[in-house]
UniProtKB/Swiss-Prot annotation:
Keyword Signal applies: yes
Keywords for the protein's UniProt record, in alphabetical order: Cell membrane, Cleavage on pair of basic residues, Endoplasmic reticulum, Golgi apparatus, Membrane, Receptor, Secreted, Signal, Transmembrane, Transmembrane helix
Disruption phenotype: RNAi-mediated knockdown is lethal. RNAi-mediated knockdown in the wings results in increased apoptosis, endoplasmic reticulum stress and lipid accumulation. This is accompanied by severe growth defects including venation defects, defective wing-hair polarity (as a result of defective fz and stan trafficking) and wg signaling. RNAi-mediated knockdown in the notum causes severe planar polarity defects affecting orientation morphology and number of sensory bristles or microchaetae.
Gene: ATP6AP2
Protein name, per record: ATPase H(+)-transporting accessory protein 2
Highest classification ranks of the organism: Eukaryota, Metazoa, Ecdysozoa, Arthropoda, Hexapoda
Keyword rRNA-binding on entry: no
One GO cellular component term: extracellular region
Record-marked site positions (Cleavage): 248-249, 251-252
Amino acid sequence: MLRVFVIFSLFIAAINASGEFTVLNRPKAISFKGNDALESHYVGDVLYASMGNAVSGDTNWNGLTINDPFNLAKGVILVHVQGIGHVTTAGNVKTYELTGSGTDASLNALAAELEAANEPVCDINFEQFDDGVQAWKSCFGDFEAPAAKPTKHLNPSLHTADKQFLQEVGFINSAADHLAEMAKPSNVLMLRVSVDGVAKAHGEKSVAVEEANKLLSAAISRLLAASQKSSDSVLFVQTTEKDVAASRAKRDTIAASTTNPYNLAVYYGSDYPVIFNIILWFMVVFGLSLLAICYAIAAMDPGRDSIIYRMTSTRIKKDN
C-alpha cells in the first residue's frame, strides 16, 4: 500500500511540475536548502525576500535561508525560459521543481512592486519581441546586438521562430558584454526568452530544441560569468516553464465581444441622472424622517393625564 501511495505521489508531482528554479550563484548571506518543490507564483516573492524585503504570502516553502541579514544580495539577475522544462547547467547549482504555470504573473507582480517602491528594475520580456528590444535598449543602451550564429537545425531563413530565438540569444550575449556599463543601472535584471516557437516548428523532442538548449546554456553561462566579475553579491537564478499554453489559457478564456469590440462604457440616457437624483434624495429624506419619528417616540412623556396612567390608576383602585 505504501509503495502504491509513493508511486501515486510521484505521478501527481510529475503532472504538476512544469519547470525548474535553479540557483546558479548566490551571495554568502543567503543559502538554498532542501528539495521541496516551489509553486511558480511564489518565484517573485523568493527574489524579493532575498533582497531583505518582507513578503506577504501563505507559502510553506522553506528553501530560502537568510544567514546574514546585513549583507544580503545587492542585485538579482533572473533568466526565465518559456517552452522548455530544463536548461543544461554546469557547476555546483541548486535546482528545485517548479509547479504550476504562474511564473510570468509572479515576475510581473515583482516588477510592479519594485517600480512602485522606486527601485530600479530592468524587465526585458521578449514575448512581445519589439517591446522586449525597446526595453533592452533602454536598459543597456542603443547597441547593436548580433544574433547568435545559426546551427545545423536552427535556420533563420526557413523558420521565423528560429530567427527570433537566435536574436533573443544574441541579446543575452550582448547583455553580458555591457552588464558593467548599463545605461539604466538596476538592482534587478529580468530577461525572459522563449523556446516555444522552436518547439512548435520542429517538435518538442527535436534536435533543433536540443541545439536551442545548448545555445541558451552557453549564453546564460556567459551572463553568469559577467555578473560574477562585476559583483560577488549577486543572486543569479534561472527558471524554466514548459507548459506555456497553460500560462496563457486565462487570457483566452473570455472571447472577444462582437457587439462591443472596443470595450466602451455602457451608454445611459439623458433621463438617468434625473431619476437617480429623485430616488437618491427621496431615500435620504425618508431615512431622516424615519429617524426623527423613532427618536420622538422614544423620548415621548405621556404625562399623568394620559390614558395609560388613567387605566392603570383605575385598575389599582378596583383591585383594592
